[in-house]
Amino acid sequence: MFSMLRRMKLDPSTYTYRTYVVSSGDNFSAARAVEFETEWLKQSPKLSFPANGSNSTESYAVVTVPRARRVHQSYLTAPLSTLQCFYACFLVLCGRHPEQKSPLPTTNSPYPDVILTNGPATAVCMVLAAKSLRLFHYLKSLFYIKDHQDRDSSRSSQVKRSEDAPAPVHFQLRTIYVESWARVTTFSLSGKLLLPFADRFLVQWPDLAGKQAWRGMRETEYAGTLVD
């Protein structure tokens, strides 16, 4: 994951707050996240932090979520641990996980703009949690519009209501899934599950390019080798 981020030209002044999600017990990835942030911010001399005294360590957070399924775990108990992982990912996306810091004042939304993942079962939980949030906000906006249209049908009151109504919360929750480098001709189980749901599905081998969950769905994108 971090080798991918090093190849990408990300502007830390645009992505002002970053959250790294690791599974429980994965201390190596947590340490790599801190190392990556330290190196990245050193290479960004133009980055300016808010005037309220926030520093580089407050512009990112490393959050640990339960594993969806541990090695050799029984399939009978796997659904329960998967639900625990899903709920933890849901809290992370809402900015309410106990290990998360308060986002910087410059952020416009409690939700992330982009979600980049290449993990196994945790990636499935994260992407599905993001899709659930987007569906919730979509349905909420539909019911809000219908409710107010039923209450008042006069044009004048509609204009007044549109002027008084608060601006909608800005959120993106765009998901990008990167298939494992080890998958050359077939998808992993996580890849098969996320193929219909991820906004962008990147593969690292040409044999997997242009695949679809079913006809009419978006195709997978060949991005070349993304790992060192």
Swiss-Prot record:
Keywords: Endoplasmic reticulum, Membrane, Nucleus, Transmembrane, Transmembrane helix
Protein name, entry field: UDP-N-acetylglucosamine transferase subunit alg14
Lineage: Eukaryota, Fungi, Dikarya, Ascomycota, Pezizomycotina
The protein's assembly and partners: Heterodimer with alg13 to form a functional enzyme.
Alphabetized Pfam families for the sequence: Alg14 (PF08660)
InterPro entries reported for this sequence: Oligosacch_biosynth_Alg14 (IPR013969)
Function statement: Involved in protein N-glycosylation. Essential for the second step of the dolichol-linked oligosaccharide pathway. Anchors the catalytic subunit alg13 to the ER.
GO CC, one annotated term: UDP-N-acetylglucosamine transferase complex
Source organism of the structure: Aspergillus fumigatus (strain ATCC MYA-4609 / CBS 101355 / FGSC A1100 / Af293) (Neosartorya fumigata)
Gene (UniProt): alg14
Domain of life where this protein originates: Eukaryota
